[in-house]
Design a protein with these regions (language model features):
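Structural motif
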Residues: 78-100, 151-154, 200-214, 236-243
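Short, solvent-exposed amphipathic alpha-helices that sit
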Residues: 57-73, 91, 175-192, 207
Length: 398
């Protein structure tokens, strides 16, 4: 009886071992298959830009830059799936739906803010807008551009670096005004005063005269000349001669002026400041990111003028490499799109290649060509460098 029981136990053990072996082999097979599926699965990033119509030059430059980024990353699983928005809001929604149907959850674009209007319908898709505006964006849109907050933060750092204590802020009465005001509130930058000005040049000069107390300083000069003329002071003729070479007399109650403007409007404001005898030699001229606009270097009367911006060395290298490959120069937005591809890949990698809308919620930093990206709670900001345009060149301060 004992031998019979032993044989039964032995047979049971043999069967159990075979069952366990079968289960282990099956599990290994499943794991290998699952791994193979994930290994073969493509990481698709959508790209929605204007590839036809008035702005096709911008879109095609962005597309080429993203392909350049893909080549740099050198991962065959990562692909860009582009679509033409025609710079139209309804077309933007249509092509975004097509990308969503392909299983794409992250889309770079659109370029222009007007094309964001319908995108909130696609709640499971995260859009990385190439715009630099943050206010009133749909909940699933993250601005990837060099926004006002990033720029004002850099200016605040420059204030501390240069011991600037009495800045006035000049803001144009434009759509960008609310972005600047929001950035000022969030960064808590130290300002002596803030003024909104009209972009119409015929109105602008009179506004700048009032801001700088030009009439009072002009009157001070006239009064002092008259006083000397009626006085018995020694060398009064020489003193009068020196005063007559001046435009105004009296101090300025600020040590720097932050001009939140660009291109010709920026130059108009600076010219009005010069007219009112407030030169960049008397106060610091500070402005926003000018993307190293070389026309500023020609305006010697405005120099030195300080501004936050991207990493110039990296930008110059990108422009050179882009030109060598495509035999044309890129636009500025294409440099941003190059970095956004790298940013998305970095965040997906950090999230174990799981693509969901949480990857932009976690606090992270990414060192791109532009500079350092800060990601937190579905917002992107940039740690910018600071430059001065002076003596026909752009010089890095920090």
């Amino acid at each position: 009886v004992c031998r019979f029981i032993i044989l039964i136990d032995y047979n049971i053990n043999i069967k159990m071992k075979k069952i366990i072996q079968f289960i282990i082999i099956t599990l290994i097979g499943l794991i290998v298959n699952i791994h193979q599926v994930f290994a073969d699965e493509k990481i698709k990033i959508g790209l929605i830009v204007p590839l036809s119509g008035q702005y096709k030059g911008i879109g095609n430059s962005i597309l080429k830059a993203t392909r350049l980024a893909i080549n740099k990353i050198n991962n065959s699983k990562l692909i860009i799936v582009p679509r033409d928005t025609k710079s139209d809001p309804k077309t933007t929604l249509k092509v975004s739906k097509e990308l969503q149907e392909k299983g794409i959850k992250i889309i770079i674009g659109p370029v222009f803010n007007k094309n964001l209007v319908y995108l909130e319908e696609l709640k499971d898709v995260t859009f990385l807008s190439l715009s630099n505006t943050n206010i009133n964006n749909p909940g699933n849109v993250i601005s990837g551009g060099i926004n006002a907050i990033s720029q004002i933060k850099a200016i605040k750092k420059f204030q501390e670096y240069n011991k600037i204590e009495r800045s006035i802020l000049l803001v144009p009465n434009s759509e960008f005004k609310s972005e600047i005001e929001d950035a000022v509130a969030q960064t808590k930058i130290k300002l002596k005063d803030k003024f909104i000005y009209d972009t119409d040049p015929t109105v602008l000069t009179s506004q700048i005269e009032k801001i700088t107390r030009y009439s009072q300083r002009k009157q001070n000069l006239e009064d002092e000349i008259k006083r000397l003329e009626n006085s018995n002071e020694v060398n009064k003729e020489k003193k009068i001669s020196n005063l007559e070479k001046r435009d105004t007399l009296g101090g300025i109650n600020f040590d720097s002026v932050i001009i939140a403007d660009f291109d010709e409007s920026l130059k108009s404001v600076a010219t009005s400041l010069l007219y009112t005898d407030v030169s960049s030699n008397r106060v610091n001229y500070i402005t926003l990111n000018q993307w190293f606009d070389k026309s500023i270097l020609k305006e010697e009367n405005l120099q030195p003028i300080y501004f936050p911006s991207i990493n110039k060395k990296n930008y110059d290298n990108f422009v050179s490499e882009y030109f060598n490959i495509y035999n044309e120069y890129p636009n500025q937005i294409s440099f941003l799109s190059f970095d956004l591809v790298g940013l998305v890949y970095f965040l997906i990698y950090k999230n174990d290649f799981i693509i969901n809308n949480k990857i932009f919620y976690k606090k992270n930093k990414f060192k791109g060509k532009i500079g350092i990206f800060e990601i937190n709670k579905n917002e992107i900001s940039h740690i910018l460098n600071f430059y001065v345009a002076e003596n026909n060149s752009f010089k890095k301060i920090f």
